[in-house]
Amino acid sequence: MSFTSRTCIGRVEASTGIARYELDQWLKAIGDAGYKRVAVQSLHVIPGEEYLSLMNTDVKKYFMIQWYPHIDVLKGTNLLSSAEDTKDVAEILYKHYESKLAGKNNIVLLMGHGNPDENYNANKKYSDMEKALQELAANNNIFVGTVDYGDMLFFPKEIEEEPANRIPVEGFDKTQYPDCMYSKVMSYCEKNGLNPSEVNVYLAPFMSIAGDHAHNDLWGLEAMAEDDDVSNVEINTNEYSWRERLEKLGFKVDRTFESHPTDQAGADHGIKDGCNCLLYTSDAADDL
């Protein structure tokens, strides 16, 4: 296993003492070892900047064309590669949260990573996932936001850049920012005649590796293990996590930490379905 994020590589080494090779080192070692066929399976959720860099630069340009054109390569897609993928993952996630979604006084919020560069159009996958989930949930009480894409942050991008307004001032117009998480949860309350204090919120990351974002941006807490009660965990210095914002708004946030619902629900990136790989043979190198 390798990571496209150097942050992940550094954190894994810091926490385990095990140094992980960067991707180019792995690919060179595999090629030098004499393998004839190599499968590269992405763990990315959306086809954003890092996924495209992985497949188009690291795998295609360097490994397949420059370094080892004689090796056949199977390229695995990201989790939400097609509309059918979105539908399948939504069904599995809905079953995972079905009991919580049965009551109007409960809402589930999923935090995706997001892609800051809109040129890739990958963030639409999160909107598609939310739509698919809400078609299954009779109460339309499950929402998807991101930690790194302006329109789908907890508050809109221009407000995120003003620390004094992290909790919106009176007069915030939700209709101007319908895709931010604040607008979604407050509009849900208004539509259903509920005060935030009457609503239970269940938080979970929608990422393949969610350590730092789950702990800091979602929960604002020190490191936790699966199913830990966050009431017993020390708050860290992150003052603007989703959890804290929701609690300041009056919502009741469930205190059970969940780090990886896609894995627990059995929907982990299509790997269980045989990698969903596309095969590129050495004979077809000119067509890549």
Stretches found by the model and what they are:
Residues 38-43, 108-111, 201-209, 279:
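Short, structured motif recognition centered on aromatic/hydrophobic residues
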Residues 1-7, 145-148:
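A short beta-strand-loop structural module common to alpha/beta enzyme folds
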Residues 280-288:
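Conserved small/polar residues in nucleotide/adenosyl-binding loops
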Residues 114-176:
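Redox- and metal-dependent alpha/beta enzyme cores, enriched for Fe-S-associated oxidoreductases
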Residues 78-81, 147, 231-276:
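Short, flexible loop segments at boundaries between secondary-structure elements
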Residues 7-20, 153-156:
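N-terminal beta-loop-helix "entrance" segment that forms/cooperates
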Residues 27-84, 90, 94-96, 115, ...:
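Hydrophobic, ordered structural segments
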Residues 15-28, 180-181:
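Glycine-rich, highly charged phosphate/nucleotide-binding loops
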